[in-house]
């Protein structure tokens, strides 16, 4: 277990009723700051670290202060804020209000969260070879 943050929900062990297989409890930590290991590690599991912030710019700075960049999440009903904040986030995907990413949208991250894209038009480019032809003909 990580030190200093407060366990709000979940924790170690499997969820009730799931004795077989590889499952972990959905887990929420509070009192997290961006210097803690739980905030600096790319965790592939149902783990949420709640990091307080004062301003929108502060939240963007915290979100971008990582070597990873798979997905960011924005919760707001303000569509202008969504556009403004999403442009500043250094991640391959931005999920708004828990709607999820469309199945035909490109999937992939920035920085150490992956190179390239899967799905969508950008995902197809991985299987194509581009050729440049220069010069002129009579």
Which role does the model predict for each range below?
Residues 1-5:
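Conserved small/polar residues in nucleotide/adenosyl-binding loops
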Residues 7-11, 74-75:
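Short beta-strand segments
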